[in-house]
Amino acid sequence: MNTYVLTAIAVLASLIILLVGRNAIKSSKKKPFQKHLLVFFGSGGHTGEMLNLLNALDDKLYSVRSYVAGSDDTMSVSKASLLSNSLPSVKSKIFKVPRARYVKQSWLTTPFTAFWSLLGSISVIFWNPFGIPDVILCNGPGTCVFICLLGYLAKFLGKNVKIVYVESFARVKSLSLSGKILMPFVDRFLVQWPDLATKYKRAEYIGIVA
């Protein structure tokens, strides 16, 4: 994972300048009181945790949503579709992005898949038909790192994006690599075990959401 993160950091600034620019910061077609929420489904148990979190959200406030999943993650796409159909008052769209790294993938080829994942993430954040999201809600490994870092960069382009990262239920005593990377960049870092909140100052204990 370190390899593709370093690759992302190396090309991120130039990609934003060349492919996005300040013209990407535009008003979306949503009412002033509506918030555009971007949700990343990290597959498997991560998706289950995210669905539980979404059940607690106010549909009226977060009535514009972008659901993002890996391009090969049919389960998460199916779950997102079911959620979208169950909330007719919510305007939503499902996006698929390439995975940053596949299970058991060689580290030698990871920079290449990571690069395509980064490009897909740029499209979801900066060329989204709903506009740049107001809130990004992420959990899970891999691609969510790009999503959150791009949201952080959007702040320097004039968009006040709030980024919330939820650490996995499986992380009881220590943070995941994604969590360690993202902690300095997110607005809220939520954990499901009290020991993590004690160990890391920025971590907020919210209880079990799995």
Swiss-Prot record:
GO terms for biological process: dolichol-linked oligosaccharide biosynthetic process. GO terms for molecular function: protein-membrane adaptor activity. GO terms for cellular component: cytoplasmic side of endoplasmic reticulum membrane; endoplasmic reticulum; nuclear membrane; UDP-N-acetylglucosamine transferase complex. Keywords: Endoplasmic reticulum, Membrane, Nucleus, Transmembrane, Transmembrane helix. Signal peptide: none annotated. It comes from the Eukaryota. It is found in: Endoplasmic reticulum membrane; Nucleus membrane. Its main location: endoplasmic reticulum. Residues 22-210 are cytoplasmic. It is a single-pass membrane protein. Belongs to the ALG14 family. This is UDP-N-acetylglucosamine transferase subunit alg14. It comes from Schizosaccharomyces pombe (strain 972 / ATCC 24843) (Fission yeast).
